[in-house]
């Protein structure tokens, strides 16, 4: 009996013809597009500024006057940053998933992953500190519609509280992910 060669075996692409490709133009026109570059650089800058503005200050904001408005504004800024970073990473991930064999695409994906991880490290403190605010204080702050709007998200974040580790350990896990 003759052995079959892997050269003669049909592949999924040869069996089904040309496979469909994602149109990622709704995210970015291309990996070198000015829109992608601007979003990434802007998010990196805004992430560092967010950390400067809020790290170590959430407990005081929650206890201060206008706590709901102040925390609501912070969550709104966090949300905008998270959306931008997610959009960039979604684009990079989908490009890579569409062609894992292309070294240029793999490099682009790796570069984006590295930059997004570095930028999001500036945001990691936010959920950790939010979970340090006691329930009664946070509940009172959520009476303000500015923060109350984010109640479902805050409740999800609070579910992670029992599993939260020391900040430095969380940072280490984040860097390694």
Per-range role (PLM):
Residues 1-177:
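A well-structured
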């Amino acid at each position: 009996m003759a052995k079959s060669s892997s050269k003669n075996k049909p592949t999924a692409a040869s069996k089904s013809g040309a496979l469909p490709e994602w149109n990622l133009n709704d995210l970015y026109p291309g990996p070198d597009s000015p829109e992608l570059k601007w979003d990434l650089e802007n998010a990196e800058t805004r992430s560092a500024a967010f950390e400067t503005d809020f790290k170590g200050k959430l407990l005081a904001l929650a206890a201060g006057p206008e706590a709901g408005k102040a925390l609501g504004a912070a969550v709104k800024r966090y949300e905008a940053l998270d959306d931008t970073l997610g959009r960039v990473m979604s684009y990079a991930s989908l490009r890579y998933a569409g062609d894992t064999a292309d070294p240029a695409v793999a490099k682009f994906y790796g570069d984006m992953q590295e930059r997004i991880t570095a930028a999001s490290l500036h945001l990691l403190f936010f959920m950790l500190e939010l979970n340090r605010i006691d329930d009664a204080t946070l509940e009172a702050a959520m009476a303000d519609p500015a923060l109350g709007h984010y109640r479902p998200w805050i409740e999800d974040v609070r579910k992670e509280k029992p599993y939260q580790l020391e900040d430095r350990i969380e940072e280490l896990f984040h860097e390694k992910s």
